[in-house]
Structures are given as structure tokens and as C-alpha cells.
Amino acid sequence: MQILSRCQGLMSEECGRTTALAAGRTRKGAGEEGLVSPEGAGDEDSCSSSAPLSPSSSPRSMASGSGCPPGKCVCNSCGLEIVDKYLLKVNDLCWHVRCLSCSVCRTSLGRHTSCYIKDKDIFCKLDYFRRYGTRCSRCGRHIHSTDWVRRAKGNVYHLACFACFSCKRQLSTGEEFALVEEKVLCRVHYDCMLDNLKREVENGNGISVEGALLTEQDVNHPKPAKRARTSFTADQLQVMQAQFAQDNNPDAQTLQKLAERTGLSRRVIQVWFQNCRARHKKHVSPNHSSSTPVTAVPPSRLSPPMLEEMAYSAYVPQDGTMLTALHSYMDAHSPTTLGLQPLLPHSMTQLPISHT
């Protein structure tokens, strides 16, 4: 586990520790043209700078002092003497123009301005960086010489890839960070990880560092905390039930008085009354809650159209005896006589009236 460090921005160095020499060319039999010898490789990946020798230096003397046998040049690839007009020279070894090729893709390097050599193997630029190039520890892509990078405990990152594993925030230069199991954490989420580990250890639960790390989903959508259930004492229930019997929907002042008497908050008492009203409404019979007594209408206020409706009502009650009594009563009294009655009988006031 890497203790908190500070970010630093660095330029990438691709081939500073590898041997990468330019292929020199010479024309045999032309003393006035000097052999081109490569310079040492620098920090850049091209490494293709070269400088011509003076005309006094002959190709044969250069070849003899560079690994070729005196009097002839032997190709390092095929082992045959080089009698061509041109030859290639890499790392003090001579090559036919057609024989110098990449050891991976076998691409001819005769027309390339540079090549790379490592452990006596020749590589083109593409295959060299595929095999030995520096990769970002976060995204796995290659890091080029022009890229800005950050280094942490031997790991190299692109600037955009050097971000917190939990919140995905890119870290700035000088900001504290931690490297935990190859994962970069900002200071805030590093402390959160330590708190999670400490809490699980205190609870006796085993947890790994991977499990203690917060993911982006946990940061953006944290799990809601479980709501603690409220328990009431017998005295508190007695006070609230007595109030509910008097008024099942108390106002704010009554709620405040109940809160002072019970020691509960107004919100808790209000929720308790809401739940009680819902239960009461659910268990009360619909017939009892919706039934209203039918009041008798004074005959003086009954208009003739209403008498006609009452006389010819199409109401059919469930009880057949009531229907028979109604017909017998209507046969015995005319509508005019019915309108002059001072009061309707009590039994008739209970009959429902319907309109057609």
C-alpha cells in the first residue's frame, strides 16, 4: 500500500535506455563518398541523426575497424560477402540492403531511416514499441514521447488516466493521493476506505481492501440508511389514543401539546395519527359510514310534480310485503288526499324515494 504522495507531471521518455541506431549506407568503390556513421541515440524515439565522415576516410578502412574482416564485408544475416554497390551498417555490423529486416514482422528496413536493436534482434519502430514500449498502467495504451505522464511507485499514467478509482476525478499536480493495489485514490476516498476497514474489523467481519473501496456507483448512488423503527410506551399510547377518540385529526397546537406530554416529536405523533386514521377507515363498514337517516318532508312543501313522482315510483324493494303494503295504501288514497295529510305515517317515512 502506497502512503499518500503528491502528484508530479513528467515528460515521457520512450527509448532513452535502449539502443536504437540509424542504418548507415555506403557506396563501395567510391572513395570520394564517405561512410555515414550513426550518432548515439538520444531520448527521442526517431534516433536517426547521422553525420558524414571526411573524404579522407575510405570505406574499406571503416569496414575493417567496424567488425568486418579485412578485405571484405560479410552480411550479418546471410553470412555472404557483400559485393553490392550499397550496404547497411547497424551496431558495427554490416548487412545487405535486402537482408536487414524486422525480426517480428519481417518488413525490410532498407528504406527506413531508423531501426531499433535489443538483445541482438532488429525491430521496426512499431514492433519495438509493441513489445518494449511503455504502457499506461490504467488504460494499457502506449505512451509516446510527446505525452505528459505521471509516475507513481514505478507505474506510469497518462494525465487523464491518473484519476481516483472511486470518484473518477482527475488529480492535479501537488494533490495528495494513495496507491492501493495498483488503484489510485484521492485523499477523501482513501480515508473512507480506511474507515470501512476499521468498521468491519470492529464488527468482527472479514473484508478485503477491494471490498472496502467505494466504486463510482456507490459514490453517485449511496445506499439509503435503514430507518429506525419508533417504539411507544404504554403511557404514550394511552395519551394518543385518548386524543384520537376525541379528535382523529388534531391541529398543530394539539400536536405540540401531545409532543410535550409524551416526549415525542410532532412528526412522529403526526405520522401515528395518519396511520390510525388509515386503519380506522379501512376497518369501518361502508354501510355504517355512508348511511344517513331519511328525514320527512313537510307536505306543505311538496309540489304536485313531486306527488306524481311519488305516486308512480318504479322503486322495487327487496321485501315483498313492503311492496304489497305500498300498493294497498296508494289504492286507498288518491294523490289529492295524500297531499292533504298533515303528517306521513312513521312507517312511510322510512321508505326510500326514487325518481324516474
Curated annotation (Swiss-Prot):
The gene is LHX8. SMART domains: HOX (SM00389), LIM (SM00132). Gene3D superfamilies: Cysteine Rich Protein, Homeodomain-like. It is found in: Nucleus. GO terms for cellular component: chromatin; nucleus. It comes from the Eukaryota. The lineage of its organism: Eukaryota, Metazoa, Chordata, Craniata, Vertebrata. Residues 225-284 bind DNA. This is LIM/homeobox protein Lhx8. GO terms for molecular function: DNA-binding transcription factor activity, RNA polymerase II-specific; metal ion binding; RNA polymerase II transcription regulatory region sequence-specific DNA binding; sequence-specific double-stranded DNA binding. SUPFAM superfamilies: Glucocorticoid receptor-like (DNA-binding domain), Homeodomain-like.
